[in-house]
Swiss-Prot record:
Organism (species): Homo sapiens (Human)
Enzyme Commission number(s) of this protein: 3.6.4.-
Binding site residues for ATP: D749, E750, M751, G752, L753, G754, K755, T756
Record protein name field: SWI/SNF-related matrix-associated actin-dependent regulator of chromatin subfamily A member 2
One Gene Ontology cellular component: nucleoplasm
Function field: ATPase involved in transcriptional activation and repression of select genes by chromatin remodeling (alteration of DNA-nucleosome topology). Component of SWI/SNF chromatin remodeling complexes that carry out key enzymatic activities, changing chromatin structure by altering DNA-histone contacts within a nucleosome in an ATP-dependent manner. Binds DNA non-specifically. Belongs to the neural progenitors-specific chromatin remodeling complex (npBAF complex) and the neuron-specific chromatin remodeling complex (nBAF complex).
Keywords associated with the record: Acetylation, Activator, Bromodomain, Disease variant, DNA-binding, Hydrolase, Hypotrichosis, Intellectual disability, Isopeptide bond, Neurogenesis, Nucleus, Phosphoprotein, Schizophrenia, Transcription, Transcription regulation, Ubl conjugation
Root EC class: hydrolase
Reported disease: Nicolaides-Baraitser syndrome: A rare disorder characterized by severe intellectual disability with absent or limited speech, seizures, short stature, sparse hair, typical facial characteristics, brachydactyly, prominent finger joints and broad distal phalanges. Some of the features are progressive with time. Blepharophimosis-impaired intellectual development syndrome: An autosomal dominant congenital syndrome characterized by blepharophimosis, facial dysmorphism, global development delay, delayed motor skills, impaired intellectual development with poor or absent speech, and behavioral abnormalities in some patients. Additional variable features include distal skeletal anomalies, feeding difficulties with poor growth, respiratory infections, and hypotonia with peripheral spasticity.
Gene name of the record: SMARCA2
Chain residue ranges for the region called Disordered: 1-71, 95-176, 212-334, 551-592, 627-672, 1344-1383, 1506-1590
Length: 1590
């Protein structure tokens, strides 16, 4: 049978104490509101005593303190214990008064102090020794008659703890007044504990000056009740003299003898007439189940505190009960239970429970969870400490002084004992008397001294008073000054608040509010900036408007010609034409598109799938009479727009805009209106300045740029296998708006947001809705060409595309398809755009799209110049994820490439943003607000032409990307090599290069920073180091494999710890390196660890790249690592299959690393991406990382700090590089290498992975410990060979030897004769460069020289092999591709004009255009005669000393012939340099000086004339090409046949000559050229054949 327990404890069998009678098991519900016996509290608190009655215990003596009141009175005492004020002087008197609510089966518990003061100590104290849990000897089991008068011994004064606990002692020492004061003090403590103020009446009651009103009423009620009790007792004294003794025995008997009986009420104590009372609620507010109803002896039938007191005039219910049961009522008060026996009973039960609990805890099962087992062990150890605690408590209590108790503290003399005086004490008394006299004398003197001191103090006080008066005056003046300072501070705060408000409005782009605040402040600089902004934006607005007007005029001309051609074709009954004027061919892409048709009578329009295909249009129109082809409406104006040419531009633009705003396919007008309203609202919201400008009555810059807007609600039907996201549709709508408004732009979405898909969507949308079928030219990096092809195949398979790449033969095979025009998109790379411009530039491209457009950030780069010079593409779009990498001119270069008519001058653009106050003469330094204002106006300028969205803004579903920089240690080999390279710029060797093998040597290397980076990555990147170590470690072939690969490098050792963990948890890795030689070492390491990997670097072919991507991305791919170079593999690749990116060494340009990271962190990634950037501690890599972080911080501001501070020079940049190489104090605290646990936290995505990684580390350490030949993870110094461990003096000696050998040679050893002079003359070398056989020609010349010598080497073959192996000398130059014939001809014409110009006596020096035309026939002095060829260096040495770059016309003509000039600008530079050299060397006013000025102007005039001719020629070419395009198919075929016949007849003729012959017939200004027509034809023939061979 288990005892009842509380919900938190475990049930256990009933107690069985050792010897002596055992109490029976406790049956039924818990006997009272307290905790049940089995709980922890039951062990500490009171134990149930003898059988309890069924109603609560009455208060003895008086009913003034019911049980609930006692419980509430105990709360402040708990607060006293909690607040730590137990040592207070009133605490002792309060502790005995406040009692816990009594257990129904026993008396109220008391503190040990109270027990001690009552003259007894518990023989078995509580195990925990808590004062509030010590049991009281007074039991609630046996009731006390309530009629006991207060005068009798044992009468109880309410609230007296001593009287309550000791009924047999005398009257209490407390008077009623003291008790009232004590209650008031308890109430005061209670209120103070709650933080409440004390009322005045309570304060007086605490001091004993007045009693509380409630207490006075209680006194009166108490007196009345005592009188009633005395009367009742006197009435019952006579008949009740004898029965008390059996009743007392009957009450004590259960407590002393019968332990086996249950603790419920006994039958001899119960009566049938006792009413059942509800149990008193527990302190927690939860009522305990009521015990069973039981009869009660008459003496115990006193009502509890819950029964209301009867009025004085009515008989008490107690009297009525006693009258009914008068036959068994005792005559006098029955004696109470013996408290000692009750205490013993409680202790027995506690010991039995403890013993049973210990036994139960010792026998716990082994399958318990760890946390429960820990709790059980703690409990078992606590129970075993019980006897020790008991002994300790007894010793402590025995040593307590009795005068600390409440009773003895009040009467301190009660316990004094008289003491006999002895002789020794008498002597001591005399001694003390003498000391007393001495002390009195000392006090007298002290008093006199104090008197003197008081006089002096008065003097001090007098002075202090007057000083304080002066201080008050000072304080007053200081307060006035403080008031003024506070006022000034408040004004300053107000100014700052206004500035913050201004900044807030500026950041929120509230321009109207910002301008108002500027006007209030009267800030001249900010007002000037705003004025500049308005002027510049107004200027740009005008430029945009003019650009759009010019484009619209060109479009009108084309439309007019097309319309005219269409009418002619309609009259001649020609075949149907496409929208661009060309005839529709069944094999062309247009034949698959639906053509919109309309019914002539009903006006019904068929479009989309219902409309007929272009190839079946004629047959469909015959089968469906009444239909005709509907006029096009989207991008072109209707026929009425062509006819009304004099109509105002504004109205036509509004009509066009309305035409696009209102959806032509919707049927209800209300829908149209609603859409128009929404579109207008959208424009207002989208444009950050439209509201302000409309308020001022002018039109917004953005609104002017995007005047024609078109709503794009869904993607094209040609775009299949996927749906565009919302932000991608917005990007498509923005690009369509650029198309509609004849503008170009930059799509600069962050990497990974699908710029490729948006571009394909634009192409398909234009093909479907605008009938613009191309051709589209897409220029991409080689690494992404395969990805673009894959995306086109996936998203737009119906688009005909050509991948223009491969060998020259492969590219040549694509030319017929290019000429036929049966394609939509041409994909090619930057290199082929430059190389094959003579083929690709002949096609008139409709759209040019450049991927990774930041490649064109240099305006003078070859790609930009070739595209601008040779290619015709009116519409252009740049795609880039990083539009602003470094400086402002790079951004201008992009904008100038897109919109040259708007962004003309770089200097104006840069000056406007860099030095806004340069013209005003003020300081140029900008504060934060001015900087932000400039950034805002840059945004304002870029807004119509640049669209950029970030991942965090548009793609919230994308998982997180977390980057960690992991510091790596160096091996001993790395540290030594790094130290010497950093200090001296030398690399230690084993001396084999000087035939001192094993003795050591040093090799000086250039580009120290690069060598330091290589040492940080891996020391075996230096081949001689690896070969020497391979010999030292016993490896053959000079190649090291196995564990020594990662022991030599700290980064490799870190990878050796990380990669196995990532493979075990199925995390796939992209590993980016900067150096391909490092990738080779990495491959050896992967082979050692059996990691399956793929490698992609700059040498990987384009077709192989697509296969590698496919292998890695396929679902069940077995490849764990993809090894990529940062530059080749970091652009445009989709590698979402990996979720871990390791950047082995950081790039100087942080955007390269960001591009690399985003190969994995892009749309489609499902897992969290971890980027681990490895960095060697205390090395150059930390400086590179810091520089990269600085650049990234700059990029976040859009404009970097260098744009506003133009003070940095090349000297400062050199100093910065030098600072990187200087020694710095090592800061080991900052550069802590992470331990395994930190590393695991970085790479683990979940808690389970972290635990697995920790176990793997433990297994690795155990395995290393078991290995008898174990070595440390990193190479240590004692493993290094002797030649590498050198002290600084020896390294200095080796360095000096190296320098001496460079200067003096190697001493006695005969040096090999090496001829360092050029074996070839300059002509031979140039010819060899052209032919591409430089090495063979050099080798031939050397062999000829060698044959001439008498002492021929015995083994020349060996030397040849050695030389061929080393390939010393000038590297083979790449053969230059020839310029277009047209450009070469123009250059020759200009130079010949300048050379042949002759001076006439009757003409001014500076020629006009008319003079240039007739100068061929003029006679006079030829000005260029002196400039044709310069004198030699021997003839005129001073010229070559003064002029650094000499040049003459002969050299210029040679360069034209060798295609050194790529544009007329390059030619102009050399001609201007020639004239400038002449002006520098010759005196001003001399003949040559004046001739050079004339030749400058002649050159410029000739170039202008050539440019005008080119423009007129282009216009005529455009007209002819359009006419050719609009001819019928049969005519086109016949033209092709004629061209082929002409080619056969004129084998060497240029293929475009037949076309251009009519142009030559036109009258145009003739530039004099002394070459005859035959010579020109021969030159054109040779150039044409050259291009054909290409």
């Amino acid at each position: 049978m288990s005892t009842p327990t509380d919900p938190g404890a475990m049930p256990h069998p009933g107690p069985s104490p050792g010897p002596g009678p055992s109490p029976g098991p406790i049956l039924g519900p818990s006997p009272g509101p307290g905790p049940s016996p089995g709980s922890v509290h039951s062990m500490m608190g009171p134990s149930p005593g003898p059988p309890s009655v069924s109603h609560p215990m009455p208060t003895m003596g008086s009913t003034d303190f019911p049980q609930e009141g006692m419980h509430q009175m105990h709360k402040p005492i708990d607060g006293i214990h909690d607040k730590g004020i137990v040592e207070d002087i009133h605490c002792g008197s309060m502790k005995g008064t406040g009692m816990r609510p009594p257990h129904p089966g026993m008396g109220p518990p008391q503190s040990p102090m109270d027990q001690h003061s009552q003259g007894y100590m518990s023989p078995h104290p509580s195990p925990l020794g808590a004062p509030e849990h010590v049991s009281s000897p007074m039991s609630g089991g046996g009731p006390t008659p309530p009629q006991m008068p207060p005068s009798q011994p044992g009468a109880l004064i309410p609230g007296d703890p001593q009287a309550m606990s000791q009924p047999n002692r005398g009257p209490s020492p407390f008077s009623p007044v003291q008790l009232h004061q004590l209650r008031a003090q308890i109430l005061a403590y209670k209120m103070l504990a709650r933080g409440q103020p004390l009322p005045e009446t309570l304060q007086l009651a605490v001091q004993g000056k007045r009693t509380l009103p409630g207490l006075q009423q209680q006194q009166q009620q108490q007196q009345q009740q005592q009188q009633q009790q005395q009367q009742q007792q006197q009435q019952q004294q006579q008949p009740q003299q004898q029965p008390p003794q059996p009743q007392t025995q009957q009450q004590q008997q259960p407590a002393l003898v019968n332990y086996n009986r249950p603790s419920g009420p006994g039958p001899e104590l119960s009566g049938p007439s006792t009413p059942q009372k509800l149990p008193v609620p527990a302190p927690g507010g939860r009522p305990s189940p009521a015990p069973p109803a039981a009869a009660q002896p008459p003496a115990a039938a006193v009502p509890g505190p819950s029964v209301p007191q009867p009025a004085p005039g009515q008989p008490s219910p107690v009297l009525q009960l006693q009258q009914k049961q008068s036959r068994i009522s005792p005559i006098q008060k029955p004696q109470g239970l013996d408290p000692v026996e009750i205490l013993q009973e409680r202790e027995y039960r506690l010991q039995a429970r403890i013993a049973h609990r210990i036994q139960e805890l010792e026998n716990l099962p082994g399958s318990l969870p760890p946390d429960l087992r820990t709790k059980a062990t703690v409990e078992l150890k606590a129970l075993r400490l019980l006897n020790f605690q008991r002994q300790l408590r007894q010793e402590v209590v025995a040593c307590m002084r009795r005068d600390t108790t409440l009773e003895t503290a009040l009467n301190s003399k009660a316990y004094k004992r008289s003491k006999r005086q002895t002789l020794r004490e008498a002597r001591m008394t005399e001694k003390l008397e003498k000391q007393q006299k001495i002390e009195q004398e000392r006090k007298r003197r002290q008093k006199h001294q104090e008197y003197l001191n008081s006089i002096l103090q008065h003097a001090k006080d007098f002075k202090e008073y007057h000083r304080s008066v002066a201080g008050k005056i000072q304080k007053l003046s200081k307060a006035v000054a403080t008031w003024h300072a506070n006022t000034e501070r408040e004004q300053k705060k107000e100014t700052e608040r206004i500035e913050k408000e201004r900044m807030r409005r500026l950041m929120a782009e509230d321009e109207e509010g910002y301008r108002k605040l500027i006007d209030q402040k009267k800030d001249r600089r900010l007002a000037y900036l705003l004025q500049q902004t308005d002027e510049y934006v107004a200027n740009l607005t005008n430029l945009v408007w003019e650009h759009k007007q010019a484009q619209a005029a060109k479009e009108k001309k084309k439309r007019r010609r097309r319309k005219k051609k269409a009418e002619e074709n309609a009259e001649g009954g020609e075949s149907a034409l496409g929208p661009d004027g060309e005839p529709i061919d069944e094999s062309s892409q247009m034949s698959d598109l639906p053509v919109k048709v309309t019914h002539t009578e009903t006006g019904k329009v068929l479009f989309g799938p219902e409309a007929p295909k272009a190839s079946q249009l004629d047959a469909w129109l015959e089968m469906n009479p009444g239909y005709e082809v509907a006029p096009r409406s989207d991008s072109e104006e209707s026929d009425s727009d062509y006819e009304e040419e004099d109509e105002e531009e504004e109205s036509s633009r509004q009509e066009t805009e309305e035409k696009i705003l209102l959806d032509p396919n919707s049927e209800e007008v209300s829908e149209k209106d609603a859409k128009q309203i929404i579109e207008t609202a959208k424009q207002d919201v989208d444009d950050e300045y439209s509201m302000q400008y409309s308020a001022r009555g002018s039109q917004s810059y953005y609104t002017v740029a995007h005047a024609i807007s078109e709503r794009v609600e869904k993607q094209s039907a040609l775009l299949i296998n996927g749906t565009l996201k919302h932000y991608q549709l917005q990007g498509l709508e923005w690009m369509v708006s650029l198309y509609n408004n004849n503008l170009n732009g930059i799509l600069a979405d962050e990497m990974g947001l699908g710029k490729t898909i948006q571009t394909i969507a634009l192409i398909t949308y234009l093909m479907e809705h605008k009938r613009l079928n191309g051709p589209y030219l897409i220029i991409v990096p080689l690494s992404t060409l395969s990805n673009w092809t894959y995306e086109f195949d996936k998203w737009a398979p119906s688009v005909v595309k050509i991948s223009y790449k491969g060998t020259p033969a492969m590219r040549r095979s694509l030319v017929p398809q290019l000429r036929s025009g049966k394609f939509n998109v041409l994909l090619t790379t930057y290199e082929y755009i430059i190389k094959d411009k003579h083929i690709l530039a002949k096609i008139r491209w409709k759209y040019m799209i450049v991927d990774e457009g930041h490649r064109m950030k240099n305006h003078h780069c070859k790609l930009t110049q070739v595209l601008n010079t040779h290619y015709v593409a009116p519409r252009r779009i740049l795609l880039t994820g990083t539009p602003l990498q470094n400086k402002l001119p790079e951004l201008w270069a992009l904008l100038n490439f897109l919109l040259p008519t708007i962004f003309k001058s770089c200097s104006t653009f840069e000056q406007w943003f860099n030095a806004p106050f340069a013209m005003t003469g003020e300081r140029v330094d900008l504060n934060e607000e001015e900087t932000i204002l400039i950034i805002r106006r840059l945004h304002k300028v870029l807004r119509p032409f640049l669209l950029r969205r970030l991942k965090k803004e548009v793609e919230s579903q994308l998982p997180e990307k977390v980057e960690y920089v992991i510091k790596c240690d160096m091996s001993a080999l790395q540290k030594i090599l790094y130290r010497h390279m950093q200090a001296k710029g030398i690399l230690l060797t084993d001396g084999s290069e000087k035939d001192k093998k094993g003795k050591g040597g040093a090799k000086t290397l250039m580009n120290t920073i690069m060598q330091l980076r290589k040492i940080c990555n891996h020391p075996y990147m230096f081949q001689h180091i690896e070969e020497s170590f391979a010999e030292h470690l016993g490896y053959s072939n000079g190649v090291i494999n196995g564990a020594e690969l990662y022991r030599a490098s700290g980064k490799f050792e870190l990878l050796d710890r990380i990669l196995p963990k990532l493979r075990a948890t199925n995390h796939r890795v992209l590993l980016f390196c900067q150096m391909t030689s490092l990738m080779t070492i990495m491959e050896d390491y992967f082979a050692f660890r059996n990691f399956l990997y793929l490698r992609l670097d700059g040498t990987t072919k384009s077709e192989d790249r697509a296969a590698l991507l496919k292998k890695f991305n396929e679902p069940g791919s077995q490849y764990f690592i993809f090894l990529l170079s940062t530059r080749a593999g970091g652009l445009g690749l989709n590698l979402q299959a990996a979720d871990t990116v390791v950047i082995f060494d950081s790039d100087w340009n942080p955007h390269q690393d960001l591009q690399a990271q985003d190969r994995a962190h892009r749309i489609g990634q499902q897992n969290e991406v971890r980027v681990l950037r490895l960095c060697t501690v205390n090395s150059v890599e930390e400086k590179i990382l810091a520089a990269a972080k600085y650049k990234l911080n700059v990029d976040q501001k859009v404009i970097q700090a260098g744009m506003f501070d133009q003070k940095s020079s090349s000297h400062e940049r050199r100093a910065f590089l030098q600072a990187i190489l200087e020694h710095e104090e090592e800061n080991e605290e900052e550069d802590e290498v992470p331990d395994d646990e930190t590393l695991n936290q970085m790479i683990a995505r979940r808690e389970e992975e972290f635990d697995l990684f920790m176990r793997m580390d433990m297994d690795r350490r155990r395995e290393d410990a078991r290995n008898p030949k174990r070595k440390p993870r990193l190479m240590e110094e004692d493993e290094l060979p002797s030649w590498i461990i050198k002290d600084d003096a020896e390294v200095e000696r080796l360095t000096c030897e190296e320098e001496e050998e460079k200067i003096f040679g190697r001493g006695s050893r005969q040096r090999r004769d090496v001829d360092y002079s050029d074996a070839l003359t300059e002509k031979q070398w140039l010819r060899a460069i052209e032919d591409g056989n430089l090495e063979e020609m050099e080798e031939e010349v050397r062999l000829k020289k060698r044959k001439r010598r008498r002492n021929v080497d015995k083994d020349p073959a060996k030397e040849d092999v050695e030389k061929a192996k080393k390939r010393r000398g000038r590297p083979p130059a790449e053969k230059l591709s020839p310029n277009p014939p047209k450009l070469t001809k123009q250059m020759n014409a200009i130079i010949d004009t300048v050379i042949n110009y002759k001076d006439r006596c009757n003409v001014e020096k500076v020629p006009s255009n008319s003079q240039l035309e007739i100068e061929g026939n003029s006679s006079g002095r030829q000005l260029s005669e002196v400039f044709i060829q310069l004198p030699s260096r021997k003839e005129l040495p001073e010229y070559y000393e003064l002029i650094r770059k000499p040049v003459d016309f002969k050299k210029i003509k040679e360069r034209i012939r060798n295609h050194k000039y790529r544009s007329l600008g390059d030619l102009e530079k050399d001609v201007m340099l020639l004239c400038h050299n002449a002006q520098t060397f010759n005196l001003e006013g001399s003949q040559i000086y004046e001739d050079s000025i004339v030749l400058q102007s002649v050159f410029k005039s000739a170039r202008q004339k050539i440019a005008k001719e080119e423009e007129s020629e282009d216009e005529s070419n455009e007209e002819e090409e359009e006419e050719d395009e609009e001819e019928s198919e049969s005519e086109a075929k016949s033209v092709k046949v004629k061209i082929k016949l002409n080619k056969k007849d004129d084998k060497g003729r240029d293929k475009g000559k037949g076309k251009k012959r009519p142009n030559r017939g036109k009258a145009k200004p003739v530039v004099s050229d002394f070459d005859s027509d035959e010579e020109q034809d021969e030159r054109e023939q040779s150039e044409g054949s050259g291009t054909d061979d290409e």
